[in-house]
Amino acid sequence: MSLASIRRLAAGAAVIAAASGGAVYLSPSVASSDKGGGPILDSLRRRLGDPTASVPSRSAQESALIAATASDPLDVLVIGGGATGSGVALDAVTRGLRVGLVEREDFSSGTSSRSTKLIHGGVRYLEKAVFNLDYGQLKLVFHALEERKQLIENAPHLCHALPCMTPCFDWFEVIYFWMGLKMYDLVAGPRLLHLSRYYSAKESIELFPTLARKGKDKNLRGTVVYYDGQMNDSRLNVGLACTAALAGAAVLNHAEVVSLITDDATKRIIGARIRNNLTGQEFNSYAKVVVNAAGPFCDSIRKMIDEDTKPMICPSSGVHIVLPDYYSPEGMGLIVPKTKDGRVVFMLPWLGRTVAGTTDSNTSITSLPEPHEDEIQFILDAISDYLNIKVRRTDVLSAWSGIRPLAMDPTAKSTESISRDHVVFEENPGLVTITGGKWTTYRSMAEDAVDAAIKSGQLKPTNECVTQKLQLLGSYGWEPSSFTTLAQQYVRMKKTYGGKVVPGAMDTAAAKHLSHAYGSMADRVATIAQEEGLGKRLAHGHPFLEAEVAYCARHEYCESAVDFIARRCRIAFLDTDAAARALQRVVEILASEHKWDKSRQKQELQKAKEFLETFKSSKNAQFNDGKHN
């Protein structure tokens, strides 16, 4: 860090401030997105606020897709059940359109469950905007800030503000980062979560006890802290899909598109041939427009029309690791501002553990990507320079890789320079493809895709987009203190076994977990725990209850053991060995819910074990409640 960098930052800040002017506080999408809705939105909000409301059954959803014939098609058929695809389904159905969605695996089974768990407010775009005097990058900052704010408000039980600390071992670094983040505060305006601030070295150590006092022969001068958003990504994705289902969309996971249907006369895409991967049954489902939101696999959908289609996806691998809770204090993240190859690495508290990452490298597209050992070691090396504790490979509880579907730029030489922004295009009539983007902006991406679908199919929505102000399932009536109701009602419950009275398994930690994972639906899970004898924990040291398996099977389209351990409950991501120990009981409960025979139970166990093998934990490490023994 140099004086020249600080001068350049100051000069760029002045130009950006002058260029943006009053637009800093402008939020043009709010007014347009808050219009309309009418009876459709009113009805949905009543269902979302009804604690007894349930999504349609899986068989009913499949029947609705089959009922979409050539003479009576859907308005929109979405391929892909990740954040973008589920967002498209929710946007379209709340505009009064007839909507279907199919996902070949599970909601959030791909990239959407393998994120850094951050809802970025575009702080890195601001740095590029300042140094490159790029107003386009500044607009991305405005957009990310607005979408972050709305996402946190629309799913408050799953999203929250998180302070992130940047260590400074040079006074120039202190000035540089402080100036940059104060400019960020100014640009954020009413979208700001909390003001950034400087902490002295002593204050920083009190806030983050494992922070290194020295780095590269320099003493810690202090830290600069700003706030970003954090989320439970896959549960947010499942919430999107279930909200869309409650609104009337026919959503079906474990349903794969095997081919697209083309009108022989017009050559327009008019539907898809779909295979139910649980039963093997195939059927046609027709639609006026098909939206390809298959993430890293969107090129494979495009190639169903033309095998020679030029790829639009540049796949990038992002690896994360999970460490015990003592690596980071609860409620404070750490940013490694520059690794040996110039990247940024985050170390964040998440669901009682610490998640660290990520990497950024070219990769091939696969349904179950695996982290390489050198990528895991890269992250460990990056954080070790900033911590005063020994960072060990044996502390890794879980490690996973996700594939970012970056929009291809043929002139780019590395994935870091390829745009993270999204692209919507229609190269074949009737097939709208959306790719790129990031979790933070999924909602506006979906809005753009639905706008394109309406134009393509000359559809007639009953109202404009309403998703900006639409709270998701579990959000209505939820408060941060909602867990206390669960604690007071269920913590002291007693059960009698053979005349011996023992306390129920639910404690305050479990009550907090249920409240944040399920929001206002948590009471239904607690009731199952109490009334059906499913109050035991699935794995020691984790708050997940047996009742969650039953609830997710009944109300969240949980159709496999992997669906549960990876995406309904996050135990596979948090602690691979604990997930393996919980597997048998998870399969037993799912078997009871779905009437599986012994053969199916054996298959589920094997598939789940193979899935867990892709999470590179430390087999020789022994943990208890996230602490190393």
Swiss-Prot record:
GO terms for cellular component: cytosol; mitochondrial inner membrane; mitochondrion. GO terms for molecular function: glycerol-3-phosphate dehydrogenase (quinone) activity. Its main location: mitochondrion. Residues 1-48 form a transit peptide. Its cofactor is FAD. It catalyses: a quinone + sn-glycerol 3-phosphate = dihydroxyacetone phosphate + a quinol. GO terms for biological process: glycerol catabolic process; glycerol-3-phosphate metabolic process; glycerol-3-phosphate shuttle. Its EC number is 1.1.5.3. It is found in: Mitochondrion inner membrane. Pathway: Polyol metabolism; glycerol degradation via glycerol kinase pathway; glycerone phosphate from sn-glycerol 3-phosphate (anaerobic route): step 1/1. InterPro entries: DAO_C (IPR031656), DAO_C_sf (IPR038299), FAD-dep_OxRdtase (IPR006076), FAD/NAD-bd_sf (IPR036188), G3P_DH_FAD-dep (IPR000447). Pfam families: DAO, DAO_C. The keyword Transit peptide applies. Expressed in germinating seedlings. Also detected in roots, leaves, flowers, developing siliques and germinating seeds. It is an enzyme of class 1 (oxidoreductase). FAD binds at residues 75-103. Required for glycerol catabolism and involved in NADH/NAD(+) homeostasis. Essential for postgerminative growth and seedling establishment. Belongs to the FAD-dependent glycerol-3-phosphate dehydrogenase family. Plants lacking SDP6 are impaired in gluconeogenesis during postgerminative growth. This is Glycerol-3-phosphate dehydrogenase SDP6, mitochondrial. It comes from Arabidopsis thaliana. The gene is SDP6.
